[in-house]
UniProtKB/Swiss-Prot annotation:
One of its GO terms (cellular component) is nucleus. Residues 286-293 are annotated as: Leucine-zipper. Isoform a, isoform b, isoform c and isoform d are expressed in the spermatheca. This is Transcription factor jun-1. It is found in: Nucleus. The keyword Transport does not apply. Belongs to the bZIP family. Jun subfamily. Residues 28-38 have a biased composition (Basic residues). CDD domains: bZIP_Jun. The keyword Nucleus applies. The gene is jun-1. It comes from Caenorhabditis elegans. One of its GO terms (biological process) is determination of adult lifespan.
Length: 319
């Protein structure tokens, strides 16, 4: 009896074991699906970060290239050892890669004209036409970030003298950033308007001329006003042409109407002249008839007088 009683639990365990075996593989499959989804999401996030980083760094590469073309600087040979060189030595539209911290420092210092890009003794350092006193290396970290902030946000540059105890260094830094702020603003606006593709970079002479105007202190509002005045003058010229055409058409219609009116007047004058001639001829005929009647009347009087003189009384006729 004990063996018979012990057998059911064994059968129950054997019946439960296949269920456990069937349920076990489902858990890892779900984990794999979840892991694939997570990987896809991570890959999408990484791609978005790469695109945003490339878009953010593209402005600095464009700024550096425009500064190089403005200063007419040419690289020579293997004396150049700069982290920016692989980008600058390629074609005008090179692929954009995320920049490191050292690349950012090199770009900022080359824009300010304080640090040479080349390390060879035969190549002169890159300098701006309006070269100002140097900035200390201790201010480089804060300086790079504050230059970017001042270029992105319009207004006076934001600079503190926490790292530089000397007030003259702070004044020099402020003047340098103020001098280069119009160029940086133009670079930021041009890069944000362009796409992330390298072949869509806006490195054209008109942009460079606009930057030179901004650097020389020419107000962009004046140029906008000039463009507005030109467009207004063109619109005025177009309106003048339209008004002239309308006036010519009106004059042509007036000339046609005047011609018709003169023709009607001439026709009426001819009709009246014909009527005058007709009335003259009629008057002449009436005058001739009147003469004939006067002659007949005179002849009748003479006849009556002759009869009365011969003794023929005629009381009905009275002279």
């Amino acid at each position: 009896m004990e063996e018979d009683q012990e057998e059911p639990p064994s059968s129950s365990t054997s019946s439960e074991s296949p269920e456990v075996v069937l349920k076990a593989p489902k858990a890892p499959t779900r984990r794999r699906k979840n892991s694939k989804k997570d990987r896809r999401q991570d890959m999408e996030v990484d791609d978005g970060e790469k695109e945003s980083t490339a878009q953010y760094c593209k402005g600095f590469y464009d700024a550096l290239r425009v500064m190089q073309t403005t200063n007419k600087y040419e690289f020579t040979g293997g004396a150049v050892s700069s982290p920016v060189l692989p980008v600058l030595q390629t074609a005008a539209f090179s692929p954009i890669t995320p920049a490191s911290a050292s690349d950012m420092h090199t770009i900022v210092m080359s824009l300010l004209g304080n640090t040479p890009i080349t390390s060879g003794p035969s190549i002169a350092p890159l300098s701006s036409p309006t070269l100002l006193p140097l900035v200390t290396s201790g201010d480089l970290d804060d300086l790079s970030m504050k230059i970017l902030a001042s270029s992105a946000i319009p207004g006076p540059p934001i600079i503190s003298s926490s790292n530089s105890p000397d007030s003259s260094t702070t004044a020099v830094t402020t003047s340098q950033i103020t001098a280069f702020q119009p160029l940086l603003n133009n670079f930021v606006s041009s890069t944000t308007a362009s796409t992330s593709r390298p072949d869509k970079l806006n490195l054209t002479p008109p942009q460079q001329s606009a930057e030179i105007y901004a650097f020389n202190g020419v107000n962009s509002d004046d140029s906008d006003g000039g463009l507005d005045s030109r467009s207004a003058s063109r619109c005025g010229m177009a309106l003048d042409d339209q008004e002239k055409k309308k006036l010519e058409r009106k004059r042509a219609r007036n000339r046609q109407a005047a011609t018709k009116c003169r023709q009607k007047k001439m026709d009426r004058i001819k009709e009246l002249e014909e009527q005058v001639l007709h009335e003259k001829h009629r008057g002449q005929r009436l005058d001739a008839e009147l003469l004939e009647l006067n002659r007949a009347l005179e002849h009748f009087r003479r006849t009556v007088e002759h009869h009365s003189g011969n003794g023929c009384p005629n009381n009905s006729i009275r002279v």
